[in-house]
């Protein structure tokens, strides 16, 4: 179980340890714009994110809206595209729709439906959840999150939104799943050749869910092929989604099917209503033939399958909250617009802080960027929480805090000024420039070196 717990002393100890590591690492950190191998978009730092309630009611409401393209419908980067349907030869566009229960089960399988790191309590804010392979947040969005995509090699506003804000993360994950569905028949097989591949039929999402984690098979480092010998004989016990079974014994889509039918409980209430779904029956000769590993050959045209039976026709969720209710109306505000930092003769630098406030409602995302390589910022992006949301028990609540210090080895002179640009993708208003004046008690020698002033 990956639920958060509030452990004040432990969190303070972790924070102190992290601060020590931060101070020790400052001089070694590569600034944005410097190539880094195997890094994520915000490396070496981690943005802050908001973690909502333990019951995940805000997240499941956002998923309901995303499933019918009512979460961020006017933003092409986050909106659902038309969902194709039809056989391999007759695909046509249809209404944007994904079964909400499927998205909820994927969110649980990916992250236990959490946006922030495990140590962050519910109803709070803190470091975002980022996996070893750059999966971000609730939907573990990896696509577009492995390198900075903004100007001058800095992270983009979209990347900040995905990393910090649950709604944008959910919307992007839903769009990626829709793109996997629409990849049939060119890149993945078609499920539901006998039901016009109707996306309202839950079982027809089998290949798209497989592809969400990676359309991989035998020979891959992680295979999701149901007939891969590593998973044993069929039928196998259903995945229970309760932490008692090894996930490595199942292909990804069977993990999702198991969680969809057996949601976790919190406070005696399931996170979402249980929704059974039928897997392809590999004891059925036609189904086993289609899903034989001998057919694992691009373009997978021999892997098309009929809808597994019994099939489940899914209706859109009832009582969907509006985008305005889920997103609120954030208002971007900040404190100081000029700060002064000092660096003593030993190279130790003072720190400055800038508070980012949300004068409205909902979750405000902010991002800080600079092209001045001697400025070190932490976190590089974060959140500020509006008056309508509960946010307690953390240093990052309700305001965001940007901490600024100096890498003295990169100072261009003993007296220097740099600029940090603060902006909000969803808070309106203009970007705000923070001027940082630096005074060092040593003179600068060759580039990248310094010496104490006598």
State each model region's role.
Residues 429-441:
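C-terminal edge beta-strand
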Residues 116-129, 221-225:
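Short, solvent-exposed loop/turn and secondary-structure capping segments
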Residues 321-359, 442-454:
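Beta-sheet-dominated interaction scaffolds and their linkers
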Residues 79-88, 94-122, 141, 208-213:
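Short, functionally critical alpha-helical segments immediately adjacent to catalytic or ligand/cofactor-binding
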Residues 37-70, 132-135, 142-329:
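Non-catalytic cell-wall polysaccharide-engagement segments
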Residues 4-35:
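Secretory targeting and sorting signals
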Residues 328-338, 359-403:
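Surface-exposed binding patches on compact interaction domains or structured appendages
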Residues 352-354, 402-406, 412-426:
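A short beta-strand micro-motif common to beta-rich folds, especially ectodomain repeats
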């Amino acid at each position: 179980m990956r639920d958060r717990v509030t452990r004040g002393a432990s969190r303070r100890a972790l924070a102190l340890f992290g601060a020590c590591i931060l101070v020790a690492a400052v001089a070694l950190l590569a600034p944005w714009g410097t190539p880094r191998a195997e890094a994520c978009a915000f490396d070496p730092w981690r943005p802050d994110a908001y973690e909502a309630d333990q019951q995940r009611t805000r997240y499941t409401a956002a998923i309901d809206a995303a499933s019918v393209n009512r979460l961020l419908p006017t933003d092409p980067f986050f909106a659902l595209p038309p969902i194709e349907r039809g056989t391999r030869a007759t695909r046509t566009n249809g209404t944007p729709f994904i079964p909400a229960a499927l998205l909820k089960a994927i969110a649980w399988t990916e992250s236990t439906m959490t946006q922030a790191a495990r140590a962050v309590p519910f109803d709070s804010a803190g470091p975002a959840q980022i996996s070893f392979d750059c999966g971000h947040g609730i939907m573990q969005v990896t696509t577009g999150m492995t390198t900075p995509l903004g100007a001058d090699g800095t992270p983009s506003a979209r990347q900040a939104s995905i990393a910090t804000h649950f709604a944008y993360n959910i919307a992007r994950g839903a769009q990626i799943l829709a793109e996997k569905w629409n990849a049939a028949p060119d890149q993945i097989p078609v499920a539901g050749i006998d039901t016009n591949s109707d996306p309202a039929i839950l079982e027809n999402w089998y290949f798209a869910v497989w592809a969400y984690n990676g359309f991989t098979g035998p020979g891959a480092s992680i295979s999701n092929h149901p007939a891969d010998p590593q998973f044993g004989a069929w039928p196998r016990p259903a995945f229970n989604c309760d932490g008692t079974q090894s996930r490595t014994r199942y292909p990804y889509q069977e993990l999702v099917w198991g969680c969809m039918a057996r949601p976790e409980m919190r406070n005696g209430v399931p996170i979402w209503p249980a929704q059974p779904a039928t897997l392809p029956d590999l004891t059925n000769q036609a189904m086993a033939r289609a899903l034989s590993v001998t057919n694992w050959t691009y373009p997978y045209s021999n892997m098309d399958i009929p809808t597994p039976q019994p099939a489940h026709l899914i209706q859109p969720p009832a009582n969907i909250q509006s985008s305005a209710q889920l997103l609120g109306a954030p208002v971007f505000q900040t404190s100081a617009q000029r700060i002064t930092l000092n660096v003593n003769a030993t190279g130790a630098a003072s720190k400055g802080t800038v508070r980012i406030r949300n004068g409205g409602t909902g979750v405000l995302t902010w991002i800080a960027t600079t092209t001045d390589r001697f400025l070190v910022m932490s976190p590089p992006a974060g959140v500020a929480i509006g008056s309508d949301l509960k946010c307690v028990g953390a240093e990052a609540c309700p305001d965001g805090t940007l901490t600024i210090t100096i890498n003295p080895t990169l100072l261009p002179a003993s007296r220097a000024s740099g600029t940090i640009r603060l902006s909000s993708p969803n808070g309106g208003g203009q970007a705000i420039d923070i001027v940082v004046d630096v005074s060092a008690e040593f003179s600068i020698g060759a580039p990248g070196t310094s010496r104490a002033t006598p």
